[in-house]
A protein has these predicted regions:
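Basic, amphipathic DNA-recognition helix from helix-turn-helix-like DNA-binding domains
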Residues: 1-17
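G2-box/ATP-lid motif of Bergerat-fold
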Residues: 95
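Short coil-to-helix segment of the ABC ATPase nucleotide-binding domain corresponding to the Q-loop/switch region
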Residues: 56-67
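A structural micro-motif at secondary-structure boundaries
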Residues: 17-44, 101, 107-111
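Short helix-capping/hinge SLiMs at alpha-helix to coil transitions
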Residues: 52-55, 70
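Short amphipathic alpha-helical/adjacent loop interface patches that line ligand
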Residues: 1, 25, 67, 83
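DNA-recognition element of transcription regulators
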Residues: 2-3, 38-48, 60, 73-92, ...
Length: 111
């Protein structure tokens, strides 16, 4: 519910730029050199959440809950698969901005 309310409060065409990637928060889309990257809803939600909190490390459970809106203890392993897919889809934009923090989770690299 909270995630839905945050989406509703966004202004149209709110944008976020991280490196060479542009996030259209209203359309829930990621662009690289004006080319849309095809992310699933879950991939986009995880990617956006990390990008909005650069440098902050999140556990798989935290990312699952942020992306899907409920406790993800049983399904947190799905985050690993989503991260793998996100990295593959962001590969044309260069080195992955998502860093694995071993034993903890993932974070969006600063810079």
């Amino acid at each position: 519910v909270a995630a839905h309310l945050r989406r509703e409060q966004r202004t149209p065409h709110a944008r976020l730029r991280r490196g060479t990637l542009d996030f259209d928060l209203a359309e829930r889309a990621v662009y690289w050199q004006d080319t849309p990257l095809k992310l699933t809803k879950g991939e986009y939600a995880i990617c956006e959440y990390l990008a909005m909190h650069p440098g902050q490390t999140f556990s798989k459970e935290q990312l699952y809950e942020a992306a899907f809106g409920y406790d993800g203890e049983a399904d947190a392993s799905a985050v690993t698969e989503h991260i793998k897919n996100i990295r593959a889809k962001l590969r044309p934009a260069g080195e992955s901005p998502i860093e694995t923090v071993w034993g903890v989770g993932y974070k969006w690299k600063n810079g």
